[in-house]
Amino acid sequence: MKNVTHSFVFLAHWPSAGSFGLNTDILATNLINLTVVVGVLIFFGKGVLKDLLDNRKQRILSTIRNSEELRRGTIEQLEKARIRLQKVELEADEYRMNGYSEIEREKANLINATSISLEQLEKSKNETLYFEKQRAMNQVRQRVFQQAVQGALGTLNSCLNTELHFRTIRANIGILGSLEWKR
């Protein structure tokens, strides 16, 4: 609030040749400066963000490829298990008289084990994809936040140089001096 008051006092006592004291220099106004800063952030931040998202996409695609390879391996195991099951069924026909129930139990156990293995693989793949997606989103958020903070700090540091600081002090001293003479 104090800065706003000083700004209006500064405008009212502008040392120009009898003018009202409004700043007509369009390049010195905050709107243009903010537009330029936001434009630069968008221009440069877009490329960085695109590269980051492309890298994350490649990682996710490689994870999907790995999961698909694991799936193919499991399907091959399933085919081997089916072949083994066929062998067991042939042996079951031979031993049907002696131990039909034993063979049926082994068959069910084999099918259940393969089914459980496939379900676990699918669940693992889905969890991996979900966590990779969450991690990518968190990294993008963190990167954007860091860039915004760095941009703001850079803008503040570039605006607060010693020349500007001394000019502001001199102008305020001049304003206070003119107020003292009017009393």
From Swiss-Prot:
GO CC list: chloroplast thylakoid membrane; proton-transporting ATP synthase complex
Family: Belongs to the ATPase B chain family.
Note: In plastids the F-type ATPase is also known as CF(1)CF(0).
CDD domains from the UniProt entry: ATP-synt_Fo_b
Mode of membrane association: Single-pass membrane protein
Keywords: ATP synthesis, ATP-binding, CF(0), Chloroplast, Hydrogen ion transport, Ion transport, Membrane, Nucleotide-binding, Plastid, Thylakoid, Transmembrane, Transmembrane helix, Transport
HAMAP family recorded: ATP_synth_b_bprime
Subcellular location: Plastid, Chloroplast thylakoid membrane
Location (main, coarse): plastid
Quaternary structure and partners: F-type ATPases have 2 components, F(1) - the catalytic core - and F(0) - the membrane proton channel. F(1) has five subunits: alpha(3), beta(3), gamma(1), delta(1), epsilon(1). F(0) has four main subunits: a(1), b(1), b'(1) and c(10-14). The alpha and beta chains form an alternating ring which encloses part of the gamma chain. F(1) is attached to F(0) by a central stalk formed by the gamma and epsilon chains, while a peripheral stalk is formed by the delta, b and b' chains.
Pfam families: ATP-synt_B
Membrane-spanning residues: 27-49
The protein, known as: ATP synthase subunit b, chloroplastic
Gene Ontology molecular function: any one: proton-transporting ATP synthase activity, rotational mechanism
Function: F(1)F(0) ATP synthase produces ATP from ADP in the presence of a proton or sodium gradient. F-type ATPases consist of two structural domains, F(1) containing the extramembraneous catalytic core and F(0) containing the membrane proton channel, linked together by a central stalk and a peripheral stalk. During catalysis, ATP synthesis in the catalytic domain of F(1) is coupled via a rotary mechanism of the central stalk subunits to proton translocation.
